Amino acid sequence: MEDLSMKRVIVITGATGTGKTTVSQYLNSHYEIPRIITHTTRPKRPGEVDGVDYYFETAESFPKNHYLEDVMYASYQYGSSYEGLDRAFEKADLVSIVLDTKGAQTYAEQLGEKAVVLFLTVGKSDILKDRLTSRGDETEMVNHRIRSKEYKRDLELPVALTGRATVIQNDDWLKTQRALDAFVSALRIQQQSVES
């Protein structure tokens, strides 16, 4: 049986546009922390690749997977599968996943100490709309998302994660990088102490 005691999932959460995917990419490129690939029924954005950015599903194929968590967001389904988690842990002991706050709570409940929550926020909400528009989302989709109850929910750190999540305000990318560097360093030290 494989020793799972050292394995950790960095659960990156926050409202859409706070930089969750950018943070996940930074962790991968600077620390070789692979991202758990999740499933969605939303259409691909320009440049996205099936099996790399998401597993792009249809309404018919989505329910055929085994999910640790899944959610409907802005009329599309999103979910992370047990198989995706296992595939990521085959690559590394420290992996990341991008989730909404509801999914982050589920991971924290289901995985306990193996789930390390990172909550991203910004100082001004108009930054979020600008980021959504600049990444190629259609204006109608952006407006739909920022009016959704899920978006409003994800702007705030859930009470269930208070005291458990590390909060990073992602207004200035250089400051965010420094905060992420300190976060990963502390996490690796913690993993090494479990190992010894």
Which functions belong to the PLM regions below?
Residues I12:
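Hydrophobic anchor at the beta1->P-loop junction of P-loop NTPases
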Residues A15:
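P-loop (Walker A) phosphate-binding loop of NTP-binding proteins
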Residues T18:
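ATP-binding Walker
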Residues T21:
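Walker A/P-loop
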Residues S29-I37:
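Post-Walker A helix-loop "phosphate-sensing" segment adjacent to the P-loop in P-loop NTPases
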Residues T40-V95, L99:
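ATP-dependent small-molecule kinase phosphotransfer cores
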Residues S96-D100, L111-S134:
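Conserved phosphate-donor/acceptor-positioning beta-strand/loop module used by diverse small-molecule
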Residues D137-V184, V194-S196:
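Small-molecule kinase domains that catalyze NTP-dependent phosphoryl transfer to phosphate-bearing small molecules
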